[in-house]
Amino acid sequence: MYQNPLKDSPERQSLVAILCAGIAVLAVLTPYDYHWTLYLSTHTIHGFAEFMNRSVFERSRLPGAGDLVYPPLIFALLLYIPSWLWKFNHRLAGGRFHTFLVSFRPLLGFTLMSAFSCALLFVHTTKQIMGRARPNEVFEGKLPFSQWYQSGPHFFTHGSFTGSFPSGHTATAAIAIIFAYVLLASLAGRRRWIGWTGLALSVLFTAVMGIARMMSASHWLTDVLFTLFSEWALIHIIFFRVLKIPEQQEYFRRHGRPQARPLFFELRIGLLLLLLCPGVWAFCTGLRSYSFEGWSWLLALTPVGLAWALFFLRRIRLALLFSPP
């Protein structure tokens, strides 16, 4: 029987600290959202902004800062898949590499699931729901300015759009925070300073990416701040509450084998989260429709989206409820 490592622990306090810091920073800096973004966009450092915004994985011709997080993700995927193969090929079992793969599998699954859930699903679903106009659209007089917590002028009935809130590039940079958590979970004793240094650098890298996006008039200050703190909090929750990585590691140390889980467990949870997103979108879009003239009938999407979301939330909950042997 394992006790929740978050009860009366630094991990819970850390989550509270992340959330409180994010709320405080947004509360203080929201009044300066428009003016600080305008200032940075008119005082841009072009070479810096262009490099930070580029990524060959997003069809850029030249590599850029956005490429830094993709090689570790690809490497994690290449290790994650064979980490399950020992179940089907006994010749792979027993060796040192097999032992390493199986013991490291929870961290590999955490890396892939967190990156998929936070940097992709959460960001793009929220973009479609909020519909906030980008700074360049506002500065050019094409669309009105709206606060980060308000419904923006974009709506799916107006055609395809990529909303400003939250920041996708900043969320991609925040994948570095995932790697820092992996380091902290892999190192012990005096070497943990490497993980803490990695965490500080990853937060700094995420913030710098956000500044570059503001310089290019692609995102508002609050887009960046919300993305940084929300992604960090979600990563923390997935690590300690959803996948319970410390408990999985402790189980392996005690028993010499991983907890019994379905094949590709973390990717299955990611797939369920993907299926959850349309329900969340439909529910929120139905609620937003009342503010767009002629589209109030879309309010009918709300109960449909709610039923869809509740169904897959239940599936996710059931998938997470299991008893280790």
Give each language-model segment a name.
Residues 118-144:
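Aromatic-rich transmembrane-lumenal/periplasmic boundary elements in polytopic membrane proteins
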Residues 1-90, 127-130, 143-145, 156-157, ...:
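N-terminal transmembrane-helix/juxtamembrane module of multi-pass inner/ER membrane proteins
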Residues 289-325:
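C-terminal regulatory/interaction regions
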Residues 88-128, 192-199:
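Interfacial segments of alpha-helical transmembrane regions
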Residues 11-16, 106-109, 193-199, 264-272, ...:
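Membrane-interfacial loop-to-transmembrane alpha-helix junctions, especially the N-terminal start
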Residues 2-3, 30, 78-97, 180-189, ...:
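Structural signal for the C-terminal ends of transmembrane alpha-helices
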Residues 15-29, 113, 117-118, 200-204, ...:
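Alpha-helical transmembrane segments
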Residues 148-298, 314:
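Membrane-embedded catalytic cores of phosphoryl/pyrophosphoryl-handling enzymes
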